[in-house]
């Protein structure tokens, strides 16, 4: 029996595809389904199923959702008695708390690149305003189907509804609900659009798409090693005589060699649903294919990929979870830096978007209070200690330099240490 016949008998040719979509292929990995590569259609699902992708997005969504949201005036002071407080309370949705809605909003925005909001008003009202909005929902992005009008100059439109032809929401039971276009509010992150769409953005995860694709390949390879019990290589009878083997006759022709290589590569490997071992009809020794857990070094690879994905969100390596649960002395400073360089500005963006979405105008807006953030509070306490020490030295400074402007020095002290 020839090698080709043996291989054809041994298993099906090629990689077995379980589901196919025009945008990506899905392969069965154990009890879960993992797409081969990051796409615009699976970014949200990957963020909810792969820990290395989930971590940085949850890092932002969880911390921002736990902030204290307030209605404030232009000077930043809370307007406690405002009727607008209803919009940032648990009254705004019967299924989710306001904190849950903010979490869903940030998670969708950072994972999919888009937060799809739906506002509802009583049927007797025709316009959406802060006084008429009775419900706010953050729709799961992978369950929303939006048809866009083609050949429209986006520079000439005045509202989002001019771009949307039809919008539907798919519920878990298979029910399709038509959405009123004028109640949709879609917020994006990033300028780059998704494919031919002028509504949806590509999202931040695409800045690490190579690392994500590598990460998914590592998961696929690890599964195959475990599922196939670690066997890796070709098993054959070893030649005992110094004579020409059947292999020389088989590979004499270039076309035959190409056919053999193609046949082996399509069926054998450590990714997809391919075999980790094969059977040869010619006298060769066991050939190792390096498909062992130790040699794959999966934990080192996934950690490297995780660090690169987290860096997109300005999260330093010391905050990325590790298999040994190691901690670092500078983790506290690192988290404070993430707040100062990323989280605070993201929280401000969320407040600006919600203020505009609810139609809040005039001298008030939605803001947040970060006084419950321990890393920022500790930094503020440190700054207050520094201010106190600086102020106690003013008299000595005046004695050493009588011409010094005390008021100017005080102003400089508060400019340097008065804010976190």
Residue ranges: model-predicted function:
Residues 2-295, 304, 308, 315, ...:
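Structured, contiguous alpha/beta core segments that scaffold functional sites
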Residues 61, 102-105, 249-272, 290-385, ...:
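C-terminal amphipathic alpha-helical
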């Amino acid at each position: 029996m020839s090698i080709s016949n043996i291989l054809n008998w041994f298993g099906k040719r090629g990689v077995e595809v379980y589901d196919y979509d025009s945008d990506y292929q899905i392969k069965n990995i154990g009890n879960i389904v993992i797409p081969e590569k990051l796409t615009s259609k699976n970014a949200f699902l990957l963020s909810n199923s792969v820990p290395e992708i989930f971590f940085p997005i949850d890092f932002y969504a969880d911390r921002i959702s736990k902030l204290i949201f307030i209605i404030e005036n232009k000077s930043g002071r809370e307007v406690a008695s405002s009727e607008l407080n209803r919009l940032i309370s648990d009254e705004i949705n019967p299924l989710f708390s306001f904190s849950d809605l903010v979490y869903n909003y940030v998670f969708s925005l950072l994972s999919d690149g888009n937060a799809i909001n739906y506002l509802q008003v009583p049927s007797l009202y025709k316009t959406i305003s802060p006084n008429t909005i009775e419900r706010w929902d953050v729709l799961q992005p992978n369950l929303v189907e939006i048809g866009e009008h083609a050949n429209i100059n986006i520079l000439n439109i005045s509202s989002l509804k001019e771009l949307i032809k039809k919008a539907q929401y798919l519920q878990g039971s298979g029910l399709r609900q038509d959405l009123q276009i004028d109640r949709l509010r879609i917020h994006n992150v990033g300028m780059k659009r998704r494919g031919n769409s002028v509504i949806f953005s590509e999202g931040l995860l695409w800045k690490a798409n190579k690392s994500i694709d590598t990460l998914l390949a590592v998961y696929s390879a690890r599964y195959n090693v475990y599922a196939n019990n670690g066997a890796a290589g070709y098993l054959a009878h070893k030649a005992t005589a110094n004579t020409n083997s059947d292999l020389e006759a088989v590979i004499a022709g270039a076309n035959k060699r190409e056919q053999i290589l193609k046949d082996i590569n399509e069926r054998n490997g450590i990714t997809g649903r391919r075999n980790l071992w094969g059977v040869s009809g010619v006298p060769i020794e066991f050939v190792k294919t390096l498909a062992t857990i130790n040699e794959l070094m999966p934990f080192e690879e996934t950690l490297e990929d995780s660090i690169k994905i987290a860096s997109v969100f300005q999260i330093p390596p010391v905050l990325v979870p590790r298999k040994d649960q190691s901690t670092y002395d500078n983790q506290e400073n690192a988290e404070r830096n993430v707040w100062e360089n990323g989280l605070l500005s993201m929280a401000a963006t969320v407040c600006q978007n919600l203020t505009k979405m609810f139609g809040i105008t005039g001298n008030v807006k939605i803001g947040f209070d970060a006084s419950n953030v321990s890393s920022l509070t500790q930094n503020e306490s440190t700054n207050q200690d520094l201010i106190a020490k600086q102020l106690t030295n003013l008299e000595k400074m005046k004695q050493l330099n009588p011409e010094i402007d005390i008021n100017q020095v005080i102003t400089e002290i508060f400019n340097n240490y008065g804010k976190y």
